[in-house]
Amino acid sequence: MIIKHDEIEPVEFDKLKIIDCTAGQDNSSSFAEITVPIGVSHKISWSNRSDKYYYISKGNVNFTVNEESYYLSPGDVCIIPKGHRFSYANTGSTEAVLILVHTPSFRLEYEVFVE
């Protein structure tokens, strides 16, 4: 399977730009690129289905996983097991880009978001 980045329509989610490279496919995992503008955060959430692997491609991001905080830079990885609460924020001075892999694949109905 070949996926062309510029053929994917980005979606907006709480000011995050998400390019879901495997949307609608029934794969064992899913892959997305997330652009996090300066000052934008992802609200507290967790998955009842998937482990999440976030690779920091560009910028700096503060992750909080189960109330522990981590400052991540390009090349760092944050692994969030299924059921663990997390959030993240771009508190840096440049846009951040994250690569996200869900295993098994992402299904919105299994994601829980705290308002």
What are these regions (language model features)?
Residues E67-K82:
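Short acidic-glycine-tyrosine-enriched beta hairpin
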Residues S41-K43, N62, C78, K82-Y88:
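Histidine-centered metal-chelating micro-motifs
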Residues K82-L108:
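Ligand-binding loop in jelly-roll beta-barrel domains
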Residues V36-I38, I56, I80:
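Hydrophobic residues in beta-strands and at strand termini
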Residues D26-N27, R49, S93-T94:
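Short strand-connecting beta-turns/loops that link adjacent beta-strands
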Residues R49-D51, Y55-V61, N66:
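Glycine- and acidic-residue-biased ligand/ion/polar-headgroup-sensing regions
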Residues M1-S29, K43, F113-E115:
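A short, N-terminal "cap"/entry segment at the start of jelly-roll beta-barrel domains
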Residues A32-N48:
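Conserved short histidine dyad/triad with adjacent acidic residue
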